[in-house]
């Protein structure tokens, strides 16, 4: 047999699809919809169930009431079925057959309402053994019981007295059970006939109903325990699922159609509830009589109450019996039923069952776990109850959920979970979560103003570890803030501070000096302190830095002191490197060594001057007597003050015409340098570096200042420490660094670390180019043997092992790399980056800088990055290095369209040929300001042109001529300037602009087409399709001209 669909079976049986679906659910077969298919065995089981439920034929639910007759063969055979004689205790727990569902016990107690009349005797004689009436709150049995016992079901305990025979014609008021007359007016059930069933006090150890096991079916149509739910009455007398006479089907009408009185509770006049086919008595396992507890207020006979008779709940008195402890229990005094819910009337409710029973019955309280929806005027069913209250009888809506839930399944208790008291930790976490800030829907930890220390170039992961947050959350926050970064990418300090402010943290960026100190402390190294006591300290020469404005004679002064000519070797006559020299002079018939450091005076070398002031003991400020105080003079003065070093002023060029040393003294007084002759403490010396005048006086002033205000001592026996003044890449010697030893003694063979470079000292040269084996404090030397070119201004120190030197250098390199990446950063927000690049609004000039010394490269890079020609163009330094231009530089420039700048270096080997072949622009410079000027011009050339409006002339309309071909033509008189053809114009009327961006398409003078009309002449102007012109209007013409970018 092929599979059939549910709706096809419903059409075949003449019932609705939902009736068939409900029957299938009661049989334990679950389908999703009316279009679902079912197997052939299920079809046969469904057919048998519907035939048994409809008196042996598959008829529609709304069939006429069947006449009393014999029960179906299956039903008639069931009471006579043999049962095992020995009752077992487990029989009360195992389902033997699906004779009946869970029932609610009845308890003694009065039932409110009119007393029912005694019922007539049943048509068929009762067996000799005493029988008991079905509990009034028992729900309809599952349809699976109609088809006989389920295979494998255990037999129940035998009942004494045998089975009750099926009594044809046994009904209520002569009507067969299975047909309901009217929804609103139910028949009187007090006239049901049958022998009085004595009630027992103890619960019957009966079998658990067969059918779907409780808890195994989360989609059952009954309560949430998995039991079949008794169907509540439907409005308008709609048939119930299962057909006429099916369990839980329509109720028969009372005698005479009168209103129901309250149902009897355990009185002798109670009749057994029919089960199965029409008129059939409910069979019991083994024919045993069911013990029944006394009903409350057990008056014999009577009508069952209806909503009209009981408009409100009784104010006092004991409640009718609630549900039994799961399944069909004895009638009790309102004791709560088990999770399975007490049986009962519509909605699974008992008669006013207490919590734990089904949903509300007659004015019932709320159903407990697994209970159904409210019934007649019932309160809401418990959570998870199926169906809810039915309309039409005042039933309140049932609990949440339409289909059954899983409460009570697998031994779990039903109903809402009880919420225990929260611990202090839970309450604290909830409180903190309430206060946690949210940025773009991302929850973040909230600080209370505590400080978070991060190094330069820190990533979001580093920040997240400090505050105990998730790095992915911080990435989401940055996306919401318009920054596209990853969790491990270095982020700028400003971005991290903004993020910290959002979460109420105070971010502290660790300075480079602090970072380096912490790094050295991790290796148990102290930098900047003299080891040993006072007995180990010896005098050292002073370190003097010569500072001042460009071209004021600093290098000439040093040449005079050293009796050399360094100026001749400097490109452009300006110093572009830091030079360190040591000279010996006689002061008061005593030889004294003085170390001089020459710093550049050009504005691009600010970092070099700061570095020179930081490593010096005394500063000589050179000021030209003819120029006076200049910008770089003030800057050098500020550097010296910041370094807290004493200053000796050398007023140079006193032999030049126009020199005025007094004027220089007066100008420097404004900056806090008061000469000794004016009552101050600053020594001023008038010199001429070119003529060699007063040089000895200057050296004497330096020595006196050092002796008077400085304690120049150091320990020469400790490991050397100092500063790298300059570094460069030599073709024959590799990386070379000029270092100034400040403490200790540097020897050949020592392992040293200079910034991110390290290595063993292979050789040392002094300022005269001679090899030396060791260098003491305040001695400048040239060091060979480093792995790479260190940065100018980096500290150096000697360590014991090569491994320690390598680890320190690698960590410094990683730190500097992160800092550079963060400094470069993301210059555009996430929202406008793509649009700006597509529209060409942002352009970048990529540069590769190579130089002869690290200080020069640093100065050039900083100067180029300070160029500001607008927001449309930006400079990006792809690479910088010391040494000649190599092939790798050309390859990098080829892939990135970069310009290579060689500062005092040339392309090496085949690099020049490759650059010419690839079309890479390589520019060579020897003077720094020339490079800056050319790059600035290139940046301005990349700018998009700016246009400005230039007015050409105005014309007044004297007459308007109409032309069928051209429209309106204005006869004008040019008042000022000139009017040209194909230029833009605007129309002005009474001082207000009427139209913009008009085009002068036609221009005539008399009958001739002309290109322009000058001031004072008349002509005709055609404005194209624009015809709204009047006399006395003014036509102003203009054009857009490119504006030079400055």
Swiss-Prot record:
Residues 688-690 are annotated as: G5. The keyword Methyltransferase does not apply. Residues 57-80, 89-106, 129-169, 195-214, 302-318 have a biased composition (Low complexity). Residues 652-655 are annotated as: G4. It is found in: Cytoplasm. Residues 49-450 are annotated as: Disordered. Residues 418-427 have a biased composition (Basic residues). Disulfide bonds: none annotated. Residues 177-194 have a biased composition (Basic and acidic residues). GTP binds at residues 548-555, 598-602, 652-655. Residues 539-711 form the tr-type G domain. One of its GO terms (cellular component) is cytosol. Residues 548-555 are annotated as: G1. InterPro entries: EF-G-like_DII (IPR053905), IF2_II (IPR044145), IF2_N (IPR006847), P-loop_NTPase (IPR027417), Small_GTP-bd (IPR005225), T_Tr_GTP-bd_dom (IPR000795), TF_IF2_bacterial-like (IPR000178), TIF_IF2 (IPR015760). The keyword GTP-binding applies. Keywords: Cytoplasm, GTP-binding, Initiation factor, Nucleotide-binding, Protein biosynthesis. Residues 598-601 are annotated as: G3. Residues 573-577 are annotated as: G2. One of its GO terms (molecular function) is GTP binding. SMART domains: RAS. Residues 107-128 have a biased composition (Pro residues). Belongs to the TRAFAC class translation factor GTPase superfamily. Classic translation factor GTPase family. IF-2 subfamily. One of the essential components for the initiation of protein synthesis. Protects formylmethionyl-tRNA from spontaneous hydrolysis and promotes its binding to the 30S ribosomal subunits. Also involved in the hydrolysis of GTP during the formation of the 70S ribosomal complex. This is Translation initiation factor IF-2. It comes from Streptomyces avermitilis (strain ATCC 31267 / DSM 46492 / JCM 5070 / NBRC 14893 / NCIMB 12804 / NRRL 8165 / MA-4680). The gene is infB.
